[in-house]
Amino acid sequence: MADTSSSQARRPFHRRRKTCPFSGANAPKIDYKDVRLLQRYISERGKIVPSRITAVSQKKQRELAQAIKRARFLGLLPYVVA
């Protein structure tokens, strides 16, 4: 078994940096009445997906969580999915 690491240097894997989907020129506004937009940031169990997975900025994640909670309170979104 030959050691390939000595003959070939391994290149590090560079992951593309994710950008916030709510920042930019034509980015959608976070609104508690926009149920279709909010459902993209809720897991199939009904939990809010963390920003490290969705790449939403910290400020927009707080706005998103507030909008989801407001929509749940008004009955537009379910609290849990069975």
From Swiss-Prot:
A Pfam match: Ribosomal_S18
Annotated segments matching region Disordered: 1-25
Keywords: Ribonucleoprotein, Ribosomal protein, RNA-binding, rRNA-binding
GO CC entries: cytosolic small ribosomal subunit
GO aspect biological process, one term: translation
Top-level taxon: Bacteria
GO molecular function, one term: structural constituent of ribosome
Family to which this protein belongs: Belongs to the bacterial ribosomal protein bS18 family.
Subunit structure comment from the entry: Part of the 30S ribosomal subunit. Forms a tight heterodimer with protein bS6.
Function noted in UniProt: Binds as a heterodimer with protein bS6 to the central domain of the 16S rRNA, where it helps stabilize the platform of the 30S subunit.
Protein name in the entry: Small ribosomal subunit protein bS18
UniProt source species: Agrobacterium fabrum (strain C58 / ATCC 33970)
